[in-house]
Regions:
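Short coil turns that connect the paired helices of HEAT/ARM alpha-solenoid repeats
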Residues: 58-66, 91-97, 122-128, 161-165, ...
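Structural detector for internal amphipathic alpha-helices that build alpha-solenoid repeat scaffolds
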Residues: 32-46, 66-78, 89-92, 97-111, ...
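Structural marker of alpha-solenoid helical repeat scaffolds
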Residues: 78, 109, 124-125, 162, ...
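Structural signature of tandem alpha-helical TPR/SEL1-like repeats
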Residues: 112-115, 148-154, 180-189, 213-225, ...
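Amphipathic alpha-helical scaffolding segments comprising HEAT/armadillo-like alpha-solenoid repeats
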Residues: 47-58, 80-92, 111-123, 144-158, ...
Length: 343
């Protein structure tokens, strides 16, 4: 049975529930006696309460499994005792979806913390869980040695043999070989698949590999050639734009990133990257794009960028800053104000 990764609509419901509980969290925070330093800020206490709330959702067996899984994934944003305990319990759950959620949470952690949660699932009874555990830990391969490699290597070998013999399987094999520095094996797969499947996702995967070995010229050639057949592919324009940006060709990068955003304006990442580069030359365009992607996605990072750009341009940012104060930590907003409004 296939188990999908956490549905982000469920994650959104968790976040909305947390926001609705915000004021009650503040009230509860006021009643908590701080440990040690009495100058612990209310923001820190509220963050702890949010973490506790997510941990409670994660472990509440009365809730639907998708909501528990979404809460578990969001615990990856924290690394306090509540997160550690809840994610560890999820990793041992009888429900594969909870174990997958534990992996997604730990994926946001670093080094040993990630390893300790995920490594026991390298030989999970559920194939989807086992596969996701391998995919999560393989990125640590260049930094591992000794017993860690001894534990991970056979899991990777087993995973490689179980991958399907189709395009998806081959692209994943090539990605794994790249992480293991088996560049010749990776390139043989990419080249063969590109010659037989000149479609955007294959070209992009091959180009990303080439960028990784600092061959941007070849990567750009692959992307431009594929764009001839697929001129409406936003992903191709975006990948090409990033390649130009890597080598300092900022105007070429700007044109390609603008193309990507115009072709797929609902993609927040495309808009954010384009606007961040565009504001060097066209601050009004950047403001327009930041405002649009924030309205579409309501990501605090997009709102922060909008406020910052308004301040850079010397425009009225009061309404933007007021909204930012409702979704971002107070110290973040205060520091932004001080950069442009020191008095």
């Amino acid at each position: 049975m296939k188990h999908r990764l956490v549905n982000w609509s469920a994650a959104l419901r968790i976040i909305v529930g947390m926001l609705l509980s915000f004021y009650s969290c503040v009230t509860l925070a006021n009643s908590v006696q701080p440990l040690g330093n009495v100058s612990v800020s209310k923001d820190v206490i509220v963050a702890e309460q949010r973490e506790q709330l997510l941990a409670e959702y994660s472990q509440n067996e009365a809730l639907p499994i998708d909501q528990r899984a979404a809460a578990t994934v969001n615990l990856g944003m924290y690394y306090g005792p509540n997160s550690i305990i809840a994610v560890a319990r999820a990793s041992r759950s009888e429900h594969p979806q909870m174990r997958l959620a534990a992996i997604q949470a730990a994926e946001q952690w670093q080094g040993k913390a990630k390893w300790d949660v995920v490594s026991p699932m390298l030989d999970d009874v559920d194939r989807d869980v086992e596969a996701q555990a391998v995919r999560t830990l393989i990125v640590l391969w260049p930094k591992l040695s000794g017993e860690y490699l001894d534990r991970l290597a056979p899991a990777i070998d087993r995973h490689l043999t179980l991958l399907s013999n189709d395009l998806d399987g081959d692209l994943e094999r090539a990605w794994i070989y790249t992480l293991q520095s088996k560049f010749q094996q990776a390139e043989l797969i990419y080249l063969d698949r590109y010659e037989n499947h000149q479609e955007p996702r294959v070209a992009i995967a091959y180009a990303e590999y080439l960028k990784g070995i600092d061959d941007d010229e070849h990567a750009q050639s692959i992307l431009k050639q594929t764009l001839i057949e697929f001129p409406e592919s936003a992903a191709l324009h975006y990948s090409l734009g990033l390649s130009y940006l890597r080598i300092g060709e900022r105007m070429k990068a700007l044109r390609r990133l603008r193309n990507a955003y115009e072709l797929e304006s609902m993609n927040g990442s495309y808009g954010y990257t384009y606007a961040t580069l565009a504001r060097e030359h066209d601050v009004e365009a950047a403001i327009t794009v930041y405002r649009a992607i924030y309205q579409d996605h309501e990501q605090p990072a997009y709102l922060y960028a909008l406020c910052d750009t308004l301040l850079v341009a010397g425009q009225d940012a009061n309404q933007c800053l007021a909204e930012l104060e409702s979704v971002a930590p107070q110290d973040v907003v205060s520091k932004l104000k001080k950069l442009y409004q020191p008095n």
